[in-house]
Amino acid sequence: MNAIATTNSDLHWNVLTIKRSGLVRDLPAGKEELMWVANSSTLICGERDAILVDTLLTTEQSQTLLDWVVASGKNLAAIDVTHGHGDHFFGLASLLERFPRARAVATPEVVKAMHEQLSPGWLENFWRRLFLDEIPDRLLVAAKQK
């Protein structure tokens, strides 16, 4: 886990970056460093409230993200999902359970892609096959931004 922050205005931001297993698992010997990728979530904070940009993929990463948001001391008002891949929204449920007044939002195109990622072809044959029991049981889709 790595975090960076800025505090140059009334708004400030913090970034949480997590290293996770990549999607390619059959690399040649000696290229193991290429078997991981980084995911990040950005918390944009005002005086009392915050907006989170993207969640993380696995149950463990989602708990790390939730703990990080709670530790900020801010009220999570919204979660903006930037695109429809599971590694950007599979962590919604735990955050929305802890912050029930928060809204998860995305563009209509992203919401459509999120629904596709939850289809059996993607969820069972891709995400759960690659990440086994690491994917959260409860998965949610964001509301369309108006």
Language model regions located:
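Surface-exposed, flexible loop/turn segments at secondary-structure boundaries
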Residues: 21, 87, 110-112
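Glycine- and other small-residue-rich loops at beta-strand/loop junctions that grip anionic moieties
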Residues: 54-55, 84
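Zn-dependent metallo-beta-lactamase
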Residues: 1-48, 57-60
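Metallo-beta-lactamase
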Residues: 4, 111-146
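Active-site metal-binding motif and surrounding structural segment of the metallo-beta-lactamase
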Residues: 60-106
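A mature extracytoplasmic/lumenal domain signature
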Residues: 55-57, 108
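Structural motif
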Residues: 49-51, 78
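Short hydrophobic-aromatic micro-motifs
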Residues: 51-53, 104
